[in-house]
């Protein structure tokens, strides 16, 4: 890193040369206390009113009597500047980073360091209702793209000095602020250090989105199930931190990462805790049942229709046979083709504008679906099975990516080897889930290894009077070895 220089002209020329052809770079040369100085800002990132009233006015109008530039610099910094965020930068790289973070950079002739003052004023999105984690009851606020605003939203939720927000810079070409959030009295120090080390080992040019950090934090990269959770809700993140987890906030994205992420987390939603226990437990069981349907139902149907027709009731068998008699494809090929078409239609609906996307969904679901059945390309029973599967896959939405691939694999297993291959595939899936241990915590905990006392928030939901007494931390789960996490 190159240090700032004492010679005023050298600093001015360096700034102007490095920001040549940058129309948003503004540099104002002036004089204060008999010495030359300059102010540098990025247009659009600072508040112009604060720049004039809180920084330039007081500094240029100061009557400072100092024998050396260093003494004058310290007096200006101590008595004249009214910015809350007041720091020093000794290198050009640090000064440029603050400059592009909404700070004003002040350089004085004869002083080899810069004064940086925070007067951010860029345009930002207001806190709105979360789109990916909608709820019927509860709060309606979500994180935004500014990491500073996200820190404030989290701090507002968790009014405790135990909440630590440790900031680091990632990216060699364009440093990006990344914040580690954790409760020092709840999270294990080994977990915090492991997450921080993984982030520091991520040698990226820049961090444009949170997804670029997921591969460095995920310990389950060879599995269908991720060890990294995401949320855009401050209330959800607060509850995860109370369980001893560590969160990662990234500048430029409203989604926050947290680890470790367990299998049971996929079936928990905010509304579960607002419902009465009996209904919350029913909804929770419904989610597990929907996950089973979305993964296994097409494969079971294909296996029964191809190899085990004797297990199907006679009336239903006649219905399936009459529908499939007119189609040119086998049950397995029909199921795969219908699923692939459904994924294409879903992807088109996501990428197109909302108004057009709804039209595509309606046309695909009604017109094309009915036309393919009428033309005899696919049978009506398989269309019903795929429709039920598609709807069920949205109930446990965090698992949608995994479910989309797994059900295709189980269709292949059922179509090629019948129920025997399907059962082997199920066993392999369960073994894979139970063998994962992200950051030293069993992924299937508290189901495997079984801990009955911790099941009150897994398959069903206990009342808050019991949950409040059992605020379990992830490192307290049976089989957890946080001290062995990497």
Give, region by region, the residue ranges found by the protein language model.
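Membrane-embedded alpha-helical signal segments
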Residues: 1-296, 314, 434-486
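Hydrophobic alpha-helical segments embedded in or immediately adjacent to the lipid bilayer
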Residues: 291-311
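Generic detector of multi-pass transmembrane helix bundles and their immediately adjacent loops
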Residues: 300, 313-486
């Amino acid at each position: 890193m190159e240090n700032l220089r004492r010679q005023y002209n050298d600093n001015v020329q360096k700034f102007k040369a490095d920001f040549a052809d940058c129309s948003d770079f503004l540099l104002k040369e002036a004089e204060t206390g008999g010495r030359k100085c300059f102010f540098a800002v990025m247009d659009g990132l600072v508040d112009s009113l604060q720049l004039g009233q809180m920084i330039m006015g007081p500094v240029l109008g100061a009557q400072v009597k100092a024998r050396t530039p260093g003494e004058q610099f310290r007096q200006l910094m101590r008595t004249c500047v009214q910015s809350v965020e007041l720091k020093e930068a000794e290198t050009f790289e640090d000064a440029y980073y603050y400059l592009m973070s909404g700070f004003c950079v002040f350089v004085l002739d004869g002083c080899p360091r810069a004064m940086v003052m925070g007067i951010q004023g860029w345009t930002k999105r207001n806190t709105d209702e979360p789109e990916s984690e909608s709820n019927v009851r509860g709060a309606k606020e979500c994180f935004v793209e500014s990491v500073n605003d996200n820190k404030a939203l989290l701090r507002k939720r968790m009014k405790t000095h135990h909440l630590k927000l440790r900031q680091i810079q990632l990216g060699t070409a364009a440093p990006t602020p990344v914040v580690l959030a954790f409760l020092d009295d709840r999270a294990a120090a080994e977990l915090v250090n492991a997450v921080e080390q993984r982030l520091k080992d991520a040698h990226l040019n820049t961090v444009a989105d949170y997804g670029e950090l997921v591969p460095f934090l995920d310990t389950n990269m060879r599995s269908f199930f991720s060890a990294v959770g995401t949320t855009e809700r401050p209330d959800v993140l607060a509850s995860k931190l109370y369980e001893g987890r560590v969160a990662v906030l990234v500048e430029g994205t409203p989604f926050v990462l947290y680890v470790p992420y367990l299998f049971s987390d996929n079936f928990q939603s905010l509304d579960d805790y607002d419902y009465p226990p009996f209904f919350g437990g029913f909804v929770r069981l419904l989610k597990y049942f929907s996950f089973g349907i979305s993964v296994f139902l097409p494969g079971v149907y294909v296996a029964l229709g191809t190899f085990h027709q004797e297990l199907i009731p006679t009336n239903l068998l006649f219905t399936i046979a009459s529908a499939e008699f007119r189609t040119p494809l086998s049950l397995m090929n029909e199921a795969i083709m219908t699923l692939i078409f459904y994924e294409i239609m879903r992807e088109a609906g996501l990428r197109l504008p909302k108004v057009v996307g709804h039209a595509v969904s309606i046309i695909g679901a009604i017109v094309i679906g009915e036309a393919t059945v009428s033309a005899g390309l696919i049978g009506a029973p398989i269309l019903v099975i795929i429709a039920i599967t598609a709807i069920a896959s949205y109930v446990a939405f965090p698992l949608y990516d995994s479910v989309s691939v797994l059900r295709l694999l189980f269709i292949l297993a059922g179509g090629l080897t019948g129920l025997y291959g399907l059962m082997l595939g199920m066993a392999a899936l369960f073994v894979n889930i139970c063998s994962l241990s992200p950051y030293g915590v069993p992924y299937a905990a508290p189901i495997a290894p079984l801990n009955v006392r911790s099941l009150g928030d897994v398959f069903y939901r206990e009342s808050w009077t019991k949950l409040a007494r059992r605020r379990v931390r992830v490192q307290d789960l049976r089989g957890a070895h946080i001290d062995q996490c990497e």
